[in-house]
């Protein structure tokens, strides 16, 4: 059995880690390199850096952060946010990222997934999906630009398309659950897992250790992403893992 992973996510804006609720109201959490080292020591299996800077200066600061972090990190580092081209991916991998996460750029140009997968290998390419449930149309749709713009692309169609194009992993954020700490969107995640064979990282809603136990007990996703509850020290990576083990689920 493949062991489940717990992955802290750091949203980085202009060189600082920030966190909001449902993609709004950002507050400063701290220095990304220091936080990355803390999670490295605390038993995290991987780290995700999401660059939400709006400026060129912010994006350049991100490269420095990645380089400083990667030189001291012993776990895989995935970097996403603002990636538009193969050149951007090359730059991130050269600065120490192990994987890249594509979102808006992949929706705009799906061939970028195939080109990136062919050039760097499927294992490097994670597709991030901000999934919004539209109650009027009774379907989940993909959002772009950090969850701000709704597209007409249905999530269940998109996940199958990206797998065929060469994505190695999916990072699915249920926007209605993000930062709410009420539990993961189990039904939605289970449905996505039934449509693809690649690993899924679940994001949005993890409010306590038990939510991660439920996630892994009720779906076959590979990993759970956590931000607020870890940054605010409401729980720790080890406490989450201990609860998962006690639930009879194999975890790294």
Curated annotation (Swiss-Prot):
Q: Which GO biological-process labels does this protein carry? A: L-histidine biosynthetic process
GO MF term set: imidazoleglycerol-phosphate synthase activity; lyase activity
Where is this protein chiefly located?
A: cytoplasm
Q: In which pathway does it act?
A: Amino-acid biosynthesis; L-histidine biosynthesis; L-histidine from 5-phospho-alpha-D-ribose 1-diphosphate: step 5/9
Catalytic activity, per the record? 5-[(5-phospho-1-deoxy-D-ribulos-1-ylimino)methylamino]-1-(5-phospho-beta-D-ribosyl)imidazole-4-carboxamide + L-glutamine = D-erythro-1-(imidazol-4-yl)glycerol 3-phosphate + 5-amino-1-(5-phospho-beta-D-ribosyl)imidazole-4-carboxamide + L-glutamate + H(+)
Record bears the keyword Amino-acid biosynthesis: yes
Q: Give the record's keywords alphabetically.
A: Amino-acid biosynthesis, Cytoplasm, Histidine biosynthesis, Lyase
In terms of superkingdom, the source organism counts as: Bacteria
The record's annotation in InterPro entries points to:
Aldolase_TIM, His_biosynth, HisF, IGPS_HisA/HisF, RibuloseP-bd_barrel
Pfam families registered for this protein in UniProt = His_biosynth
Q: Mind telling me which SUPFAM superfamilies this protein's record contains? A: Ribulose-phoshate binding barrel
Q: How does it assemble?
A: Heterodimer of HisH and HisF.
What exactly does this protein do?
A: IGPS catalyzes the conversion of PRFAR and glutamine to IGP, AICAR and glutamate. The HisF subunit catalyzes the cyclization activity that produces IGP and AICAR from PRFAR using the ammonia provided by the HisH subunit.
Q: What is this protein called?
A: Imidazole glycerol phosphate synthase subunit HisF
Q: What is the lineage of its organism?
A: Bacteria, Bacillati, Bacillota, Bacilli, Bacillales
Protein encoded by which gene: hisF
